[in-house]
Swiss-Prot record:
Site residues, Transition state stabilizer: T71, Q145
PANTHER family: CUTINASE, CUTINASE 2-RELATED
Cystines in this chain: C60-C133, C187-C194
Protein name, as recorded: Cutinase 4
UniProt PTM: The 2 disulfide bonds play a critical role in holding the catalytic residues in juxta-position; reduction of the disulfide bridges results in the complete inactivation of the enzyme.
Natural source organism: Emericella nidulans (strain FGSC A4 / ATCC 38163 / CBS 112.46 / NRRL 194 / M139) (Aspergillus nidulans)
Amino acid sequence: MPLPLLPPLLLPLEALLDLALHLVDSTGVAYSARQVTPTAPLPRLRGSSTSNDVTDNSGCKELTFIFARGTTEIGNMGTVVGPKVGEALKSLTGNKAAIQGVDYPADAAGNAALGGSGGPKMASLVETALKQCPDTKIVLGGYSQGAMVVHNAASKLSSGQVVGAVTFGDPFKSQKPDNIDQFKTFCASGDPVCLNGANVMAHLSYGNDAQTAAQFLVSAAGL
């Protein structure tokens, strides 16, 4: 199934942050549906921005989570939501989850590739994980550009290789990925990427959905 055209408002993460700064007036109040202020503390980040349980062949776990970060995020997991989902999965499964980030450029130019710069790498990681641990349950996740990576990777996989997937701020939120039965997407109200909204901070809020996403993936895996 061909992927839809890229929404015109899909901006790189650093551009979203720059725009967010310009939305703050002299009183220090950000124009956001959630009334985010620059003096309010950001949510505490949990987990690491890099995780390589598959590529390091760290041992078989009941669940394997492969995640693609958003544009310009650091490491291979990013910081907005990937590490938080990973930590939640470990907690919910009693540390029986392997976590792997997709090492792809995640640069602004990659948005035009509609996930093509990371999709093949994510699909390859799925194959590697199943070769190392045939009984593990594979689940996928992606944020922003990384969400497109999930769609691209799914089209290269066979039915049954991946039991579930979640995406956040997904430009293709209306399209269920190929070959994945259990799929859930998170799109915050006002998100300029998945809803063509005007609330830039909404696109950075998906850490709030990490626990719900992890619970969905654990259920999809039958654990």
